[in-house]
Amino acid sequence: MVKQDYYEILGVSKTAEEREIRKAYKRLAMKYHPDRNQGDKEAEAKFKEIKEAYEVLTDSQKRAAYDQYGHAAFEQGGMGGGGFGGGADFSDIFGDVFGDIFGGGRGRQRAARGADLRYNMELTLEEAVRGVTKEIRIPTLEECDVCHGSGAKPGTQPQTCPTCHGSGQVQMRQGFFAVQQTCPHCQGRGTLIKDPCNKCHGHGRVERSKTLSVKIPAGVDTGDRIRLAGEGEAGEHGAPAGDLYVQVQVKQHPIFEREGNNLYCEVPINFAMAALGGEIEVPTLDGRVKLKVPGETQTGKLFRMRGKGVKSVRGGAQGDLLCRVVVETPVGLNERQKQLLQELQESFGGPTGEHNSPRSKSFFDGVKKFFDDLTR
C-alpha cells in the first residue's frame, strides 16, 4: 500500500515552518484522538498517521532525509529503532498537546496564555444608542516577528532541558516518598533557549502599541463590556493570546436621561399653555416632533412617545421617550402683564383660587382641619 505524503497528512506545504506544522498537528490530533473516537478503528489509524508525520517533520534530520528520499529513508529500520511499526505512543501526545485534559501527561507546564487587557471607552448618548465604530490604540505585548514567539534565534530551536529531560518536572526523594516538583532549571517548560532571539531576548514577545477598529453595537449602556477575542497580550512562547475587553461608559447628556431602554427629558411650558393647552415641539434623538399638551396640565405630568427611546442591544422592543412637563412661573413682567394677572387672580376668587385650583382647595381644607383639631 502506498503511504500518503506526510505534508498532505498534516495539510501543510513543503516549506512550512515548524510552528505551522505544530499548529496543524494539534488541530488534527485533537480531532482524531482515540479518547474522542473510542472504538473507531479508522480514527485510530488516522491518528497514527498524523503522529508519524508530525514526528518526522518536526525533527530537522528526519525531515531532511524525508525531503530527499521520501518514505524510503525510513524503511527497514532506517529510523534507528524509533520507527512507527508498533502502536502509537499516546502518552507523548497527552503530555505535549493535551496536557492534563486527558490525564496522561508527563507533567510539562504549558506556556502561559497571554494576559487579558481592558480598555475604558467613553461614548456620547447618541453613539451608544445608534452604534459606532471607533479606532483605539493600546499598548500590549505582541508575538516577536523575528522568532515567531519561540524566543530562539532564527535557525535555532529551544533545546531539551538536561535536568528534567523535557518532562518539566524533577523527582525529589524524601525517605520512602518520591515527590514531583517543577523543574527549577527550565521552570517547567521542558526546554531551554541556548541562543536567544536578538529582538525579544528570548521572551518571545515584544512591547508594542497597536491600533484596533472596535464596532460598538447599537443600544449599549454604561457597564456593558465588549470582548475582542485574541486581542490581548500574546502568550508566552507561542501560547494563545489573551482577550481585550472594552468597557463602555456613556457620558451625561445635556437633555436626556436614560433609564434602561427609555429616555426622559424635561419640557418647560408657560402657565398659559398649561392652562389652555396647545402644541409644542419636543426634542428626540431623531429630531424635533410635535407634542399636544391638553388644557389644565400640571407640573410633573409625563407624556409618553412610543418607540422614541433606545433599541435594546440584546433584542426586543424599542424603548420610549417620556417628556416630563415643568410649568414655569413667568418672570420679567411689564405693568400690563401684571395688571392682567391681577385681574385673573381676582377672577379666581382670591389668592387660593379654590374653584380653579383643586390641589389648592385640598391643601387649604387640610390646613383648616389641622388647626380645628388643635383648638378642640
From Swiss-Prot:
Required cofactors, per record?
Answer: Zn(2+)
Q: Which residues bind Zn(2+) 2?
A: C161, C164, C183, C186
Q: Which residues does Zn(2+) 1 bind?
A: C144, C147, C197, C200
Coiled-coil boundaries? none
CDD domains documented for this protein: DnaJ, DnaJ_C, DnaJ_zf
Where is the protein localized? Cytoplasm
Which parts of the chain are CXXCXGXG motif repeats? 144-151, 161-168, 183-190, 197-204
- Zinc in keyword set: yes
Q: Which UniProt keywords apply?
A: Chaperone, Cytoplasm, DNA replication, Metal-binding, Repeat, Stress response, Zinc, Zinc-finger
What are the GO MF terms of this UniProt record? ATP binding; heat shock protein binding; unfolded protein binding; zinc ion binding
Q: Name one GO cellular component term.
A: cytoplasm
- Domains (record comment): The J domain is necessary and sufficient to stimulate DnaK ATPase activity. Zinc center 1 plays an important role in the autonomous, DnaK-independent chaperone activity of DnaJ. Zinc center 2 is essential for interaction with DnaK and for DnaJ activity.
What does the similarity note say?
Belongs to the DnaJ family.
This protein's name: Chaperone protein DnaJ
Chain's gene name: dnaJ
